[in-house]
């Protein structure tokens, strides 16, 4: 009797179980990998590119070993206004550097920084900022530098959002990074920022290991401590300026393959996108336009937006994007939410 009662149940399970197994993948496929993006041309372009380069029957199929995507950092992956995060770090290190080198106290631009005049600091020239960076990012071992940056990031907060800088990553771009990796792409940060600085937190914040960070790089010197242990000291010598034409040069030097997709947000990314999209088969170039003063900042001067020295997006760059088929991402229209903590 027991066996007879069980047979109908077993028969039912034999029918239902295959249906369940069939529907589970279907539900998974229907999950939106880019939920923080509004439906629109930018989101569709990402899906189309990934589909064309990863489906084996596609004429534009790219083997996994060749799948490279590069991402600028400042203004593309996280907030860059009102001042680049690394520059803020360097400015806050000036008093300590001057303490060790008192002769810098009355010398510009260190004198201006010590005075704490924000308006005057904002007007510092690129040459003056480079002098500050050279003084504050050298003269210590690589290990000491990494420890210093970690310590600073643990307490430093953005003046507007009152949150750690590492929390101010753009959720839509974090989703793109994960989506690309889920489809066999190796993701790289290619930044004008300091390579050693970004490598400290890139794996934790972006899921990108330090060896996949290409940035502006300074020299190091090999030596030994008093116990004979070898170490590297950071020196004020520029090896690679990873801005403008330096980006494709850095990509060739450090990666060795032309990317199939590149993301940026400013004139400093133009050559990287040119280099990427000049290749054969499907290519994707995307630029983030900061046009959302309510949730973040609005700056260009493309499309009549306010001009800026930080993350400049000119009308000429906008015109080139349209000419070359690059997709301009409107922060205001294309991103449903900006940060992971947004409701």
Sequence positions of predicted segments:
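A metal-dependent, Asp-based hydrolase signature
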Residues: 83, 88-167, 171
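Asp-based phosphoryl-transfer active-site loop
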Residues: 67-81, 273
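Short regulatory "switch" loops immediately downstream of catalytic or recognition motifs
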Residues: 1-2, 52-55, 276
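C-terminal cap/substrate-recognition subdomain and adjoining C-terminal extension
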Residues: 29-37, 41-47, 51, 66, ...
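Bacterial N-terminal signal peptides
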Residues: 12-26
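Bacterial N-terminal signal peptides that target proteins for export
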Residues: 2-15
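N-terminal carbohydrate-binding/catalytic regions of secreted carbohydrate-active enzymes
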Residues: 49-54, 58-68, 81-82
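Short, solvent-exposed loop/turn and secondary-structure capping segments
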Residues: 80-83, 88-91, 200-201, 275
């Amino acid at each position: 009797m027991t066996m007879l009662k069980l047979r109908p149940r077993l028969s039912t399970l034999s029918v239902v179980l295959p249906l369940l197994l069939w529907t589970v993948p279907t539900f998974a496929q229907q999950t939106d990998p880019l939920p923080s993006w509004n439906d629109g041309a930018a989101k569709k372009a990402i899906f189309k590119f990934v589909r064309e380069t990863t489906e084996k029957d596609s004429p534009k199929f790219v083997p996994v070993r060749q799948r490279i995507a590069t991402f600028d950092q400042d203004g593309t992956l996280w907030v860059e206004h009102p001042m680049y995060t690394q520059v803020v770090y360097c400015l806050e290190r000036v008093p300590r550097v001057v303490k060790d080198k008192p002769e810098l106290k009355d010398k510009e631009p260190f004198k201006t920084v010590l005075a704490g005049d924000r308006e005057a600091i904002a007007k510092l020239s690129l040459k003056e900022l480079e002098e500050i960076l050279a003084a504050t990012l050298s003269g210590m071992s690589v290990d000491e530098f990494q420890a210093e940056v970690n310590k600073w990031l643990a307490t430093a907060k953005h003046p507007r959002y009152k949150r750690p800088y590492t929390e101010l990553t753009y959720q839509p771009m974090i989703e793109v990074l994960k989506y690309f990796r889920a489809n066999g792409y190796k993701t790289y940060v290619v930044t004008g920022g300091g390579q050693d600085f970004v490598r400290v937190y890139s794996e934790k914040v972006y899921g990108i290991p330090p060896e996949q960070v290409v940035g502006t790089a300074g020299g190091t010197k090999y030596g030994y401590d008093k116990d004979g242990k070898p170490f590297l000291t950071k020196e004020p010598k520029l090896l690679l300026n990873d801005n403008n034409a330096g980006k494709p040069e850095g990509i060739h030097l450090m990666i060795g393959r032309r990317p199939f997709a590149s993301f940026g947000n400013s004139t400093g990314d133009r050559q990287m996108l040119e280099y990427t999209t000049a290749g054969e088969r499907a290519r994707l170039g995307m630029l983030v336009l900061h046009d959302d003063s309510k949730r973040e900042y609005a700056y260009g001067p493309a499309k009549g937006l306010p001009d800026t020295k930080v993350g400049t997006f000119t009308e000429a760059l906008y015109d080139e994007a349209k000419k070359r088929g690059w997709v301009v991402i409107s922060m205001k229209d294309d991103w449903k939410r900006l940060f992971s903590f947004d409701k």
